[in-house]
Regions:
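Bacterial signal peptide processing site
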Residues: 15-20, 138
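Juxtamembrane membrane-water interface segments immediately C-terminal to a transmembrane helix
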Residues: 22-25, 29
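Sec-dependent bacterial lipoprotein signal peptides
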Residues: 1-14
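C-terminal amphipathic alpha-helix
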Residues: 30-40, 46, 93-143
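Alpha-helical segments in soluble extracytoplasmic regions
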Residues: 31-88
Length: 143
């Protein structure tokens, strides 16, 4: 009898809890235009313009995708910081033609941070958050 009562009450409790994905999906839709503009940009530094948006999405993200957002954001923040520490404008940096006043230590630090951005873990995490937006929210992060 208790089992029957629990089963009957479960839909009531589930209905009151709301959809934990809804807030995240709202955030995805809210930020979609900004991410679309950044994705379409030919400016190499435009990606750093997405970081505040990525932070917002990370904050809204359900637990099952939050770690992937962290894996995307952390290397980008590190690269952004290394570039700033070395006085390098992200939009103008080219590994094959670094600024003349950039010392070897700075160049190596930038290259190490850039490798992390392009690392398999980062790329896999980005693919996961993109797929999650499609699967759960029914829309891509950018169009």
């Amino acid at each position: 009898m208790r089992l029957v009562a629990l089963l009957l009450l479960f839909p009531l409790g589930a209905g009151c809890s709301g959809d934990p994905q809804a807030g995240y999906c709202d955030a995805v839709e809210e930020h979609q235009r900004v991410l679309t503009d950044i994705a379409a940009s030919e400016d190499a530094g435009a990606l750093f313009g997405a970081l505040d948006t990525y932070d917002d999405l990370r904050e809204a993200a359900p637990r099952d995708i939050a770690d992937d957002w962290d894996a995307v954001i952390a290397p980008l923040r590190w690269l952004e910081q290394v570039l700033a520490d070395n006085g390098v404008e992200p939009s103008s940096y080219a590994a094959d033609e670094p600024p003349a006043d950039l010392d070897d230590q700075g160049r190596e630090a930038i290259e190490a941070a850039a490798r992390e951005v392009g690392a398999e873990q980062t790329v896999t995490a980005m693919a996961a958050v993109e797929q999650h937006a499609l699967d759960v929210c029914g829309t891509p992060l950018s169009r």
